């Protein structure tokens, strides 16, 4: 195999591995992989560097709670391809906008948080359906859980329902169990106990279907607790 072909093969394997870890929220494995593989030296295209910094920023956010550093990485990721004058957006640009919103909320900057979360939703209308569109279900989860943390439960429920509709539209269960789980949690907070239990059963069923064992255990724990 020529050096050029070998380089392309290595590059493809690196991106594929990163996507598996990232899409399944396996951030500890992703962070270790980014560090040990030194993969940034293999990336030269803007879209690849964007994905690298998106992954890095996500690891800083979810694992290290280093929100300022996470925001820096996410903004750097966005700048590789994003322009506010664009008439269309890529899937990852929309996802990064949403994650920037979440990060601002964690930093206590609520107004900026919802600005970016709503920007990501507004950009959704410019995306054509493709094989990776299902990933965008995450943006509904992000804005809904941010509303829940903000105590605006009715708005949270609206976006959870929209997320469920979107998942059905793209015929993919990515983040579907998480959406139903959050719906159940909010329904329970609103004292709609029977509805909450029903929604948690749905969340559990979807989690089992996609083999999300962590969420299976969590949903069962809630069901047992709420039925007491």
Predicted regions and their residues:
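Helix-turn-helix repeat elements of alpha-solenoid scaffolds
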Residues: 21-36, 63-79, 110-121, 152-161, ...
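Alpha-helical adaptor scaffolds
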Residues: 96-171, 175
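Structural motif corresponding to the intra-repeat A-B loop/turn of tetratricopeptide repeats
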Residues: 24, 63-64, 100, 107, ...
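Residue signature of alpha-solenoid helical repeat architecture, marking inter-repeat boundaries
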Residues: 8, 47-49, 84, 88-91, ...
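Structural register within alpha-helical repeat arrays
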Residues: 17, 56-57, 100, 143, ...
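Residue at a conserved register position within TPR or TPR-like alpha-solenoid repeats
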Residues: 21, 60-61, 97, 104, ...
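Amphipathic alpha-helical segments of tetratricopeptide repeats
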Residues: 34-42, 75-86, 118-129, 161-172, ...
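Residue register of alpha-helical TPR repeats
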Residues: 12, 51, 88, 95, ...
């Amino acid at each position: 195999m020529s050096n050029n072909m070998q380089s392309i093969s290595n590059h493809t394997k690196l991106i594929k591995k990163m996507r598996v870890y990232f899409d399944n929220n396996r951030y500890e494995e992703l962070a270790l992989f980014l560090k040990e593989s030194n993969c940034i030296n293999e990336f030269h295209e803007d879209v690849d560097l964007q994905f690298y910094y998106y992954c890095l920023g996500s690891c800083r956010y979810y694992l290290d709670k280093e929100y300022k550093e996470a925001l820096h990485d996410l903004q750097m990721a966005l700048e590789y391809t994003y322009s506010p004058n664009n008439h269309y957006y890529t899937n990852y640009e929309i996802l990064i906008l949403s994650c920037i919103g979440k990060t601002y909320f964690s930093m206590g900057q609520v107004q900026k948080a919802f600005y970016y979360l709503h920007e990501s939703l507004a950009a959704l209308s410019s995306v054509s359906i493709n094989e990776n569109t299902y990933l965008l279900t995450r943006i509904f989860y992000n804005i809904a859980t941010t509303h829940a943390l903000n105590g605006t439960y009715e708005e949270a429920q609206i976006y959870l329902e929209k997320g469920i509709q979107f998942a059905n539209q793209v015929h993919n269960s990515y983040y579907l169990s998480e959406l139903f789980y959050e719906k159940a949690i909010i329904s329970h907070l609103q004292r709609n106990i029977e509805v909450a239990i029903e929604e948690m059963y749905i969340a559990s069923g979807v989690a089992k279907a996609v083999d999300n064992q962590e969420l299976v255990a969590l949903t069962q724990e809630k069901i047992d607790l709420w039925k007491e």
